[in-house]
């Protein structure tokens, strides 16, 4: 196991999401679901494949379903009334992810979002997900500081690839990968454009991608 991929359910209710995730005909599943009150339910054993990522890639991993644990957070998503993730839900997520990290010997940077691994198709867990907060617990990374830099698309794509993004995925390209990066590290302004702030953040995240950085916040972050 190499990754933990975070999702939102994107359905009207927890019951509807659970029904879909346990329906063999739906051809979609996840290892865990965490309700808004923090109740966590295991659906698929960690040593078995769950069908949660779809066409996706991260670093050298092209078969994300076969190399990751998928966690679904109950949230209506952008189609049904996207809303902040409650503290109880995030506390349960942190506890679960720390246990998964310990069981599988995963580094902090192994915790990513669905939109990170599938930037052309997905936007979950979305701009309201508290990436900075969970990085403070050793789940994901957050740059301690950053400096605006002159935009350089070649250098930006090199940095994004070093972080793990895959511009080569079907129907993907620079703008979609940049938007996915912004959704994770600059959620207050997601436009897919390589501006000086985004350029500086790419360099900062790349430099901090092996250890969690617990202080400071990127623009618009929670």
What would you call each of these model-derived segments?
Residues 2-109:
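Active-site-adjacent loop/helix surface patches within enzyme catalytic domains
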Residues 54-57, 87-105, 109, 119-222:
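Cell-envelope/ECM-targeting effectors and their regulatory/trafficking segments
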């Amino acid at each position: 196991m190499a990754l933990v991929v975070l999702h939102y359910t994107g359905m009207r209710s927890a019951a509807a999401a659970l029904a879909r995730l346990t329906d063999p005909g739906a051809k979609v599943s996840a290892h865990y679901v965490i309700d808004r009150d923090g109740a966590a339910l295991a659906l698929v054993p960690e040593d078995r494949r769950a069908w949660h990522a779809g066409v996706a890639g991260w670093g050298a991993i092209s078969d994300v379903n076969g190399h990751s644990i998928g966690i679904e957070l109950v949230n209506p998503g952008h189609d049904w009334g996207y809303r902040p993730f409650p503290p109880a839900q995030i506390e349960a997520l942190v506890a679960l992810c720390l246990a998964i990290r310990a069981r599988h010997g995963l580094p902090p940077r192994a915790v990513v979002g669905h939109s990170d691994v599938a930037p052309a198709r997905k936007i979950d867990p979305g701009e309201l997900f508290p990436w900075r907060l969970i990085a403070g617990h050793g789940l994901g990374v957050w740059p301690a500081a950053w400096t605006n830099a002159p935009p350089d698309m070649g250098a930006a794509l090199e940095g994004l690839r070093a972080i793990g993004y895959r511009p080569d995925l079907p129907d993907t390209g620079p703008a979609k990968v940049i938007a996915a990066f912004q959704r994770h590290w600059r959620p207050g302004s997601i436009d897919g454009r390589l501006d000086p702030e985004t350029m500086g953040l790419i360099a900062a995240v790349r430099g901090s991608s092996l250890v969690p950085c617990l202080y400071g916040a990127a623009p618009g972050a929670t």
